[in-house]
Amino acid sequence: MEHVTVQGVSIPAIGLGTWRMTGPTCRRAVSTALDLGYRRIDTAQAYGNERAVGAAIDVADVDREDVFLTTKLDASNRDHDAVLDSTRESLDRLRTEYVDLLLIHQPNPIADLETTLDAMDELVDEGSVEHIGVSNFGVERLHAAREHADSPILADQVQYHPFWEQTTLLDYCAINDVMLTAYSPLAHGGATADDVLRDVGARYGKTPAQVALRWLVQQDKVSAIPKSTSPEHLEANRQVFDFELTDEEMDAIARPSLSRTASSFLRQHLPF
């Protein structure tokens, strides 16, 4: 597994996303991923699966310090006490003393960003959180967060795949040493049936999904958290570091005009 290094922190370039996984299904997927060699797991308070994620990590034959664990603050947990209390509750559910990365899950125009960040800084100071970041922030909001927080903003987690443009944010992250984490990296399944990805994959003996993931992690400061509960797909999603796309292939794969493959919710609410 290759890593992305930002601000001196080394993070697995591919992790497991757990959105819409719950209960035993989530626990099995996380356990399988860890057995296969995944060392990065992404969850959120809003997913309702922190207990399942924590249970899987707790019994895995992997040291906790070797797993890069991310969770996210629920939209309702924005004021000072709510940030502190909800994060400590997350730690209990996750059966851990700390998370490697705590994100603000999404911008909230009626919440005070500075208050949220101040509380997150406190969590870093007390050792409950190693690093902080944001999710679904555009450049303007990301810059504001970086300007205010005492702790460096390590990452911005956003929707990104070959059919969804993030050029301005990518440039900002590369210049400022911030990791861009791509969620929904397979375009909600749209990548798996794409002819361009299929044709490129045929040259390397790779699936369209593997080509889409390779396209992401081959970019500067970019990582991805594909979701899967299938052992076969979990393993396949890891096998993207034994080939390299040409510049021409990278350009051909990027087709943001096909953003119609995104879900209706994301079309309505992104970019922020």
Where are these regions (language model features)?
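N-terminal binding-site loop/beta-alpha segment at the start of enzyme catalytic domains
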Residues: 1-67, 270-272
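Acidic (Asp/Glu)-rich catalytic clusters
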Residues: 5-6, 34-35, 54-66, 88-97, ...
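Short, well-ordered coil/turn segments that N-cap beta-strands
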Residues: 9-14, 38-40, 62-67, 96-100, ...
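Short, acidic/polar
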Residues: 22-34, 79-94, 115, 142-143, ...
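Glycine/small-residue-rich loop that forms an oxyanion/phosphate-binding "nest" at active or ligand-binding sites
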Residues: 72-122
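Beta/alpha (TIM)-barrel catalytic core signal, keyed to glycine-rich beta->alpha loops juxtaposed to Asp/Glu
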Residues: 107-272
